[in-house]
Amino acid sequence: RSTPIKSSAASDVYKRQVYTSEPDTMKMKNYNIQRRGVLIMKCIGIIGAMEQEVAKIKEKMQDVTITSRARMDFYEGTLEGKKVVVVRSGIGKVNAGMCTQILADVFGVEAVINTGIAGSLNNDVNIGDIVLSTDVLHHDMDAIGFGYKKGQIPQMDEFSFPADEKLRKLAAKVCKEVNPEISVFEGRICSGDQFISDKSVKDAIISEFGGFAVEMEGAAIGQAAYLNHIPFLVVRAISDKADGSAHMDYAEFEMAAIEHSVKLTVRMIQEL
């Protein structure tokens, strides 16, 4: 149910967009106002697994209040004039899932953006490139002995969790503006509680799931956001090729990849 919002300017057409909770559509339960096709969010959660992934974002914030929950510090304030909550979740899926649930329960965020770095799963995706999630899944979930597909969580119909299309389209547009020299890919991101640095493991993930990038948090964030009917997007800059060269590549390109991801995230907030 919704009530139309009147606009004093004929050129600015506002409307309430009602989101339902059907699990196959991944629509928001919250009401957002939409103007000229752009979502206007009241509060946006930004998650990075490591301090390096959120430090530069926090430096740009104003009017900051810090709230501690579950050994995580949530920085609540404004960024580019928008209300945000920025947090370092810690590495791994349990940390990431807990962090997302706290953002939903305590701060009532209306969208979640996960920024960070990842390994490439696609030969066309090179170090420094950006991958925007179409969907996310757990590559290390294995309950095939109970009749489920590999990657599928038992007692859940969903095999993967779809990211928000509007957020993804905005990110793709923004990336071309702020990082025109960087290639942007839209595709599946696979998550597991392991750093992939073995080509045989990488090849097995590709064979089973496809995908464009592999990392350690996105699927947990996507699952928690999905179950709370909150739109999400995972933004990953590629730091390594997820093979035998991964450790060497990661050390060399980590900070440059983080810079790309942070730059894109901040500009997205500006336009939301």
Stretches found by the model and what they are:
Residues Q194-D243, H247:
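A C-terminal functional module that forms or caps the active site or interfaces directly
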Residues R1-Q17:
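Single conserved hydrophobic/aromatic residue that forms the stacking wall/gate
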Residues I102-V106, D124, Q223-P231:
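Alpha-helix C-terminal capping segments
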